[in-house]
Amino acid sequence: MLPMITGFMNYGQQTLRAARYIGQGFMITLSHTNRLPVTIQYPYEKLITSERFRGRIHFEFDKCIACEVCVRVCPIDLPVVDWKLETNIRKKRLLNYSIDFGICIFCGNCVEYCPTNCLSMTEEYEFATYDRHELNYNQIALGRLPMSVIDDYTIRTIWNSPQTKNG
């Protein structure tokens, strides 16, 4: 008889403990009901990136002096700089400049150390493609400025994200 009573007491204690845990979880769930939704309907809603966002690199061909500083400071030696030495003026002439964004880690060293400021980071972050070879941008593709998200009337921009309010 005594083991049966202790068994019922253990069962009762376990039931109360389980009810307490369920109540705690329910209270956490209720505390989240008055928060803004975190989910963003991506193609139709886009977050405005911060001022220091590291997006696609923009390249200005006319400013580049082919010094290859960007290649030396890149942790993966990514930018490909082809140049030719002009013997009559003893100066380098840039022939081709390309970056493969499938490999780029967007560290920003090339932009930071460029002596002529011919490289800059843009707010563009959409690189979705079916072929990875399309991510290899030459100087013509790097020279195009991305369309601003703010100016696109088909996209609803979200200025204040719930994540930035909490942090």
Swiss-Prot record:
Broad enzyme group: translocase
Keywords, comma-separated and alphabetical: 4Fe-4S, Chloroplast, Iron, Iron-sulfur, Membrane, Metal-binding, NAD, NADP, Plastid, Plastoquinone, Quinone, Repeat, Thylakoid, Translocase
Binding site for [4Fe-4S] cluster 2: 74, 104, 107, 110
Residues where [4Fe-4S] cluster 1 binds: 64, 67, 70, 114
The EC number(s) this enzyme carries: 7.1.1.-
UniProt subcellular location: Plastid, Chloroplast thylakoid membrane
Coiled coil residues, start to end: none
GO BP annotations, alphabetical order: photosynthesis, light reaction
Molecular function GO terms recorded: 4 iron, 4 sulfur cluster binding; iron ion binding; NADH dehydrogenase (ubiquinone) activity; quinone binding
InterPro entries documented for this protein: 4Fe4S_Fe-S-bd, 4Fe4S_Fe_S_CS, NADH_quinone_OxRdtase_chainI, NDHI
Cofactor(s) this protein cannot do without: [4Fe-4S] cluster
CC cofactor note: Binds 2 [4Fe-4S] clusters per subunit.
Membrane topology summary: Peripheral membrane protein
Pfam families membership: Fer4_9
Domain 4Fe-4S ferredoxin-type: start-end pairs: 55-84, 95-124
The reaction(s) this protein catalyses: a plastoquinone + NADH + (n+1) H(+)(in) = a plastoquinol + NAD(+) + n H(+)(out); a plastoquinone + NADPH + (n+1) H(+)(in) = a plastoquinol + NADP(+) + n H(+)(out)
This protein's GO CC annotations: chloroplast thylakoid membrane
Function: NDH shuttles electrons from NAD(P)H:plastoquinone, via FMN and iron-sulfur (Fe-S) centers, to quinones in the photosynthetic chain and possibly in a chloroplast respiratory chain. The immediate electron acceptor for the enzyme in this species is believed to be plastoquinone. Couples the redox reaction to proton translocation, and thus conserves the redox energy in a proton gradient.
Family indicated by similarity: Belongs to the complex I 23 kDa subunit family.
PANTHER family recorded: NAD(P)H-QUINONE OXIDOREDUCTASE SUBUNIT I, CHLOROPLASTIC
Subunit structure: NDH is composed of at least 16 different subunits, 5 of which are encoded in the nucleus.
Protein name in UniProt: NAD(P)H-quinone oxidoreductase subunit I, chloroplastic
Organism: Arabis hirsuta
Classification of source organism: Eukaryota, Viridiplantae, Streptophyta, Embryophyta, Tracheophyta
